[in-house]
Regions:
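Small/polar, glycine/serine/threonine/aspartate-rich low-complexity segments that form flexible
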Residues: 74-113, 237-244, 277, 290-331, ...
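Bacterial Sec-pathway N-terminal export signals of envelope proteins
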Residues: 27-76, 82, 114-115, 231-270, ...
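Bacterial N-terminal signal peptides
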Residues: 14-24
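Periplasmic alpha-helical coiled-coil/stalk elements that build and connect Gram-negative outer-membrane
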Residues: 2-7, 145-258, 374, 378, ...
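Acidic, low-complexity, intrinsically disordered peripheral segments
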Residues: 3-7, 81, 426-472
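A glycine-/polar-enriched beta->alpha junction
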Residues: 37-47, 54-70, 101, 109-126, ...
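Amphipathic alpha-helical coiled-coil segments
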Residues: 48-63, 142, 146-165, 176, ...
């Protein structure tokens, strides 16, 4: 009986005798690059960041409007009832009513050009440019982080898919063993104890498969949420080794130089500084050039006629026309301490931005170091996991041979088979963890999108090359 079971066992698990490796799929496949590009095009998080950046660009235009003159036109027509000293005087002298009712008409146009406002316009433009640049780099940072999320989901799905394959093959081998043992037991040639043992192991194999299928289902949902498509025909990606840092020091230097989150935080500091400079403009006078013209009729109860019948001419018309060109200076001498308070507020905002930048710096150093350490330790771990797989294969094969000779029990063979399954699963998990660690390192240094050769949308470059922004 043991000889037959051992022979069946060797046949049933022959497909599992190879070491677990990452095997790319064939045919039409959805690459990691395609998945990331799709996510960047459709994910709401990126759309939020993009629209925030575009809104900041409009703030630049609002600030730049301070360099240009304002032109206003006004017109009006309506009935006016007037009782004034002049109407009462006419009433007393000539016996007319004290109230005058006329149709009043007004037309006017005015132009104002700010000549000097304490450099407020210049500083506001600078502030808005730095804020737009900060939002632009925040957009790129969001894209980097989303690319890492998609990469992780992509690899997690592939890993879950391959673990399901392992679990299915493990169940298949246990099912064959169970069928052989049950057949022998039913014919009276086998032991009920052997049947109980293999039944328990078969149940665990079923449980392992269900757990693997559950993990695969979860991985599919995570992927669909990020990419908005169903994962199909995926292939194992290969990180760009040339872009990976060769040391932790190099990785940290790359992160400090290239990470978009740090660049965004630096621009926030510059924007806060420009805001403080803009508040100082309140200490200076404002000089404007005003040009205006007005054409009015029947103002203030005066229609150009006289109540004195002896005046000549009796009607000179009620129109009043005026053209004015004047340079004005306005200097606020006291504002209740508001100007000083605004300056202090801006100073605190600078300190806040610096603290945010320092926090971002620490986070990036932490993330880079963790990614580097994960890669280093996984490289060390994998050689032992590989040895574990190889040793488990040898042990399983030896136990099968010994089982046929009656030197090993069925439980020994089942234990060796289960250990091989666990060893392969651990090695497979470590291989994918190593891949994820490499992509984490590319993300931590701000190089992930570039390493994936993702084409950045043209609109992300902005309408101009702003101070501190992404230069196109």
């Amino acid at each position: 009986m043991r000889k037959n079971v051992g022979h069946s066992l060797r046949k049933s698990v022959a497909a599992l005798a190879v070491t677990v490796v990452l095997l790319p799929t064939t045919g039409a496949a959805q690459s990691l690059e395609q998945a990331v590009a799709s996510a960047l095009d459709t994910h709401p998080q990126i759309r939020q960041a993009f629209n925030r950046f575009k809104a900041s660009e409009e703030l630049i235009k609002q600030a730049e409007s301070g360099y240009y003159p304002t032109l206003d036109f006004d017109a009006g027509i309506g009935r006016e009832w007037t009782e004034s000293p002049s109407t009462r005087r006419d009433s007393a002298q000539y016996g007319v009513g004290e109230e005058v009712e006329l149709t009043r008409r007004e037309i006017g146009v005015s132009l104002r050009q700010v000549l000097f406002n304490g450099f407020q316009t210049m500083n506001e433009v600078e502030r808005s440019e730095y804020e737009a640049s900060a939002d632009q780099w925040a957009l790129f940072s969001s894209a980097e982080d989303l690319a890492l999320e998609v990469t992780r989901a992509y690899l997690e799905f592939l890993r879950a898919e391959q673990i399901v394959v392992l679990a299915e093959r493990n169940l298949e081998s246990h099912q064959i063993i169970y069928d052989q043992v049950k057949q022998k037991t039913d014919s009276g040639l086998g032991s009920t104890a052997d049947l109980s043992q293999v039944t328990g192991r078969l149940a665990r194999a079923h449980s392992n498969l269900i757990s693997a299928q559950n993990n695969l289902s979860d991985a599919r949902i995570v992927y669909q949420k990020l990419v908005n498509t169903t994962p199909e025909d995926m292939r194992i990606p290969v990180p760009d080794a040339l872009m990976l840092p060769e040391s932790l020091t190099q990785a940290l230097d790359m992160a400090k130089t290239s990470h978009p989150t740090l660049k965004s935080a630096n621009n926030d500091i510059q924007a806060a500084t420009a805001q403080r400079d803009a508040t100082k403009g309140n200490y200076y006078p404002q000089v404007t050039f005003d040009l205006s013209a007005s054409w009015d009729d029947n103002l203030d109860g005066n229609d150009g006629t006289t109540a004195n019948p002896f005046d000549s001419p009796a009607d000179v018309g009620g129109n009043s026309d005026e053209v004015l060109a004047i340079v004005r200076l306005n200097y606020n001498l006291f504002s209740g301490g508001a100007d000083r308070a605004r300056e202090r507020e801006a100073a605190y905002s600078i300190n806040e931005s610096k603290a945010i930048q320092q926090e971002a710096y620490r986070d990036i150093v932490e993330g880079t170091t963790l990614a580097w350490n994960a890669r280093e330790f996984l490289n060390q771990q994998m050689q032992y996991l590989r040895q574990h797989v190889e040793a488990s294969i040898e042990t399983r094969n030896a136990y099968e041979d010994q089982f046929k000779l009656g030197q090993r029990t069925l439980i020994d063979v089942l234990d060796s088979e289960n250990e091989l399954f666990q060893a392969r699963r651990e090695y497979l998990t470590a291989e994918y963890d190593d891949l994820i660690a490499r992509y984490r390192l590319l993300n931590a240094t701000g190089q992930l999108l570039e390493s994936l050769r993702i084409t950045i949308p043209e609109v992300w470059s902005g309408e101009d090359n702003y101070k501190g922004g992404v230069q196109s």
